[in-house]
Amino acid sequence: MIEIKRIQQQPDLAQAIYAVMAAVYLVSPWTLEQIQADLSQDQTWYALAYDRAEVIGFLAVQENLFEAEVLQIAVKGAYQGQGIASALFAQLPTDKEIFLEVRQSNQRAQAFYKKEKMAVIAERKVYYHDPVEDAIIMKREIDEG
């Protein structure tokens, strides 16, 4: 059974999160040190998806009084398509606007985000590197979760 746990300021879990990134991405977008630093931030929290003791997915969020930004979301390949990303997304606050950025070429992620009531609001040119690509900025309004 998959269990979702919300954590904050637990840099000791960085290795497990990094392992998910390494399994999902060809090259992890963040280093282990960046994840550890992010896990130490006051305004950052993570939702982790566990299969028994193994972290199989996560959602990284930076939140303030008025809004939240999805920094990362990833689920290991063997667990994709089972509703885990939606369960992670369900941890987001419904009383705040939610923002995120996604690669223009990542149509699968964009379709998922639209299913989660996110809408395209802008584009950032040449935002990503390796490869260089534009970012699509998406937003979910308050109470549309």
Each predicted region: which residue ranges?
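Conserved catalytic-core motifs of GNAT/GCN5-like acyltransferases
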Residues: F99-R103, A119-I136
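Conserved acetyl-CoA-binding loop-helix of GNAT-fold acetyltransferases
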Residues: V75, G81-T94, R108-K115
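Extreme N-terminal starter segment of soluble prokaryotic enzymes
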Residues: I2-I4
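Conserved active-site tyrosine of GNAT-family acetyltransferases
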Residues: Y113, M118, M138
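Acetyl-CoA-dependent GNAT
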Residues: R6-A78, S86-Q91, E141-E144
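Structural preference for beta-strand elements that scaffold enzyme active sites
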Residues: E67, E97-F99
